[in-house]
Amino acid sequence: MSVFESETSNFHVYNNHEIQTQPQMQTFLSEEEPVGRQNSILSLTLDEIQMKSGKSFGAMNMDEFLANLWTTVEENDNEGGGAHNDGEKPAVLPRQGSLSLPVPLCKKTVDEVWLEIQNGVQQHPPSSNSGQNSAENIRRQQTLGEITLEDFLVKAGVVQEPLKTTMRMSSSDFGYNPEFGVGLHCQNQNNYGDNRSVYSENRPFYSVLGESSSCMTGNGRSNQYLTGLDAFRIKKRIIDGPPEILMERRQRRMIKNRESAARSRARRQAYTVELELELNNLTEENTKLKEIVEENEKKRRQEIISRSKQVTKEKSGDKLRKIRRMASAGW
C-alpha cells in the first residue's frame, strides 16, 4: 500500500488498488495519532497541570487561570522541545492576549465555571440511544480534575470547538461506502487516471490558527499554514457565516443606507421648502409694513401742510386788524 502524506497536511491518500476495509482504516487512525497531539498541553488533565505548576486552580478566576496556564505551557515546551519533529505541529493553543473572555467569565473562578458546566449538562442530558451519545455522557460526567484542558476551554466558551471534517467515499468509484473518506479522482504527471481515497483526520482546528492542505500527485506536495491576517479573516468568516449570508447582509445594509440617505434628503428638502415659505411670508409682511409706513408719512405731511396754511391765514388776519383806521374825535 502506498501512502502519500504531507508533512503538515491533515489528509492521507490511499491507492485505489489496495483499499483497506473500514475496521482496518479505523485501527490505522487510532495508531496514527500525532505525537505532538499526545504531548500537547491540551491533552493534559487539570490535575496533571496542577501537579506541574504546583498551584490549585479551583479558587482562581479565569484571568489568573490563563496566566498560570501559559507558564505551564512554556515549561512543557521547554521539556519536550526536542521531541517534536519539524514536520509535526501539535494543536496550537492561542496566546492569552488573543483569547476573548466575556466580562462575567473573567470574574468567575474555575470552580464556579465548572459548576455552571455541570448544571448545563444536567439541564440538557444527552440521549442514550447510540453508543456515541453514551460515551459522550460518560465523558461529561467526569470531575474537574479528570477533564482535559481542551474540553474545559471548549465547554467554558474560551476556545471554539474544533472543526471535525467527516467526508464520505463515493460508492460509484470504489464500490463501497465506509464511514469516512471521500472519492477523489486526480491525474498524475503521466496523464494516467488514478483514483485515490482521501480521508481527513479529526485534528483540532482552532479559529486562531488557519490551516489549509492540498494534495498534488506526482513529485509535488503542497501544504500551507495560514497565520496573522489570514487567520483573522478565517475567524471572522467562521463567526459571520457563509459568503451567501454575508452578501445578503451587505445588500440589506446597502438598502438601509440608501433609505437613510433618501430620508435625510427628504428632511433637508422639507426644511428648505419651509424656510422658503417663511421667507416669502416675511417678505410680504415687510412689504405691507413699508406701505403702511408710507401712508402714515403722507398723512403726517398733509397734516403739517394744512396746519401751516391755517397758521398763515391767522397771521394775515391779525395784520389786517392792526392796520384798520382808528375812530377820530367828535369835534
From Swiss-Prot:
List the signal peptide residues.
none
Q: Where is the composition biased (Basic and acidic residues)?
A: 296-320
The bZIP domain sits at 247-310
Stretches the record annotates as Leucine-zipper: 275-289
* Predominant location: nucleus
- Where Phosphothreonine occurs, the residues are 143
One Gene Ontology cellular component annotation?
A: nucleus
Its keywords, alphabetically, are: Abscisic acid signaling pathway, Activator, DNA-binding, Nucleus, Phosphoprotein, Transcription, Transcription regulation
User: Segment Disordered: which positions?
Assistant: 296-331
Q: Does the keyword Protease apply?
A: no
Which Pfam families does the annotation name?
bZIP_1
Which GO BP terms sit in this record? Answer: abscisic acid-activated signaling pathway; positive regulation of DNA-templated transcription
In which tissues is this gene expressed?
Answer: Predominantly expressed in seeds.
Family statement? Belongs to the bZIP family. ABI5 subfamily.
Role noted for this protein: Could participate in abscisic acid-regulated gene expression during seed development.
| Name of the protein | ABSCISIC ACID-INSENSITIVE 5-like protein 1
This protein's gene is called: DPBF2
